[in-house]
Swiss-Prot record:
The keyword Nucleus applies. Residues 244-349 form a coiled coil. It holds the Pfam family TAFII55_N. Overexpression of TAF7 in HeLa cells inhibits cyclin D1 and cyclin A gene transcription and causes the cells to accumulate in early S phase. In contrast, depletion of TAF7 from TFIID complexes by siRNAs increases histone H3 acetylation at both cyclin promoters and stimulates cyclins CCND1 and CCNA gene transcription. Its main location: nucleus. The keyword Chaperone does not apply. It is found in: Nucleus. The lineage of its organism: Eukaryota, Metazoa, Chordata, Craniata, Vertebrata. Belongs to the TAF7 family. GO terms for biological process: chromatin organization; DNA-templated transcription initiation; estrogen receptor signaling pathway; mRNA transcription by RNA polymerase II; negative regulation of DNA-templated transcription; negative regulation of MHC class I biosynthetic process; negative regulation of MHC class II biosynthetic process; negative regulation of protein kinase activity. The gene is TAF7. This is Transcription initiation factor TFIID subunit 7. Changing residue 5 to R: Abolishes methylation in vitro. Ubiquitous.
Length: 349
């Protein structure tokens, strides 16, 4: 297709939101919906040179207005048949009109400043006056503060106190008359303590020798007593052997009884482990039944919704969702049957 030279290029629309007091907003809304030709005479917008203030006249009633920046960009849509919508522009500003306000606010005279930081800060403060903290609906009140909070900056940790303490210690060391240092190893101290326990002093040797002679006399008396009582022990030796045989049989019985108790404990532990496994599988089966019931309910609601919808595209979309639910239902049924088979095999054991 050839494009004629007379065709003008398409221009992008520049749009903003106009917010009026309730009584004037209803008047403008009725005039727009009625489609009067004289709408330009009833509604006029005039902006001042600063680009932030202006005057909006509704039926020749002047309203003070201020152009503010919205928290985020919104899309503007246009429709002709109320079915198909077309995007026309991105909106980021709103003209707020009030009854009580200065129609002609005082003009701020620029002040020449040599400091670039001060001038930059002043421009930033000036822009803050025209920042709108709220959205265009009630739930979005203070949305700029709630959604766009300032992030905490990473602060580098400085340690001036530590450096000051190190300098103080170094200065005191330099002023000292003399210094002495000693390295103590933990292993060496332990060895010295062990050696100190084994080595005795020479002053104690005489006392140790006298003590050994007394112990020798006591041992001689004990051996004499033992030799005199050896005959009595021979008489009672036969009786002790019989007692030992009786004790051995009792120990064998106790050992057998202990083995049986251990076997019963092991069997009891195996039964407890099986019971816990059965309870775990039963819990999984109950959960899977709940999920399966929920999936079936969702599929039933989706089928009812498909029956009510007449739009073909929407019906196809709902049908795709229903197919996914059916596949999910089949998978859950397979999982449930496998869990039930596993539970039956455990119960048979």
């Amino acid at each position: 297709m050839s494009k004629s030279k007379d065709d003008a290029p398409h221009e992008l629309e520049s749009q903003f939101i106009l917010r009026l007091p309730p009584e004037y907003a209803s008047t403008v809304r009725r005039a727009v919906q009625s489609g009067h030709v004289n709408l330009k005479d009833r509604l006029t917008i005039e902006l001042h040179p600063d680009g932030r203030h202006g005057i909006v006249r509704v039926d020749r009633v002047p309203l003070a207005s201020k152009l503010v920046d919205l928290p985020c960009v919104m899309e503007s849509l246009k429709t002709i048949d109320k079915k198909t919508f077309y995007k026309t522009a991105d909106i980021c500003q709103m003209l707020v009109s009030t009854v009580d306000g200065d129609l002609y606010p005082p003009v701020e005279e620029p002040v020449a400043s040599t400091d670039p930081k001060a001038s930059k800060k002043k421009d930033k403060d000036k822009e803050k006056k025209f920042i709108w903290n709220h959205g265009i609906t009630l739930p979005l009140k203070n949305v700029r503060k709630r959604r766009f909070r300032k992030t905490a900056k990473k602060k580098y940790i400085e340690s001036p106190d530590v450096e000051k303490e190190v300098k103080r210690l170094l200065s005191t060391d330099a002023e000292a008359v003399s210094t002495r240092w000693e390295i103590i190893a933990e292993d060496e101290t332990k060895e010295a303590e062990n050696q100190g326990l084994d080595i005795s002093s020479p002053g104690m040797s005489g006392h140790r020798q006298g003590h050994d002679s007394l112990e020798h006399d006591e041992l001689r008396e004990i051996f004499n007593d033992l030799s005199s009582s050896s005959e009595d022990e021979d008489e009672t030796q036969h009786q002790d052997e019989e007692d030992i045989n009786i004790i051995d049989t009792e120990e064998d019985l106790e050992r057998q009884l202990q083995d049986k108790l251990n076997e019963s404990d092991e069997q009891h532990q195996e039964n407890e482990g099986t019971n816990q496994l059965v309870m775990g599988i039963q819990k999984q089966i109950d959960n899977m039944k709940g999920k399966l019931q929920e999936t079936q309910d969702r599929a039933k609601r989706q089928e009812d919704l498909i029956m009510k919808v007449e739009n073909l595209a929407l019906k196809n979309r709902f049908q795709a969702v229903l197919d996914e639910l059916k596949q999910k239902e089949d998978r859950e049924k397979e999982q449930l049957s496998s869990l039930q088979e596993e539970l039956e095999s455990l119960l048979e054991k």
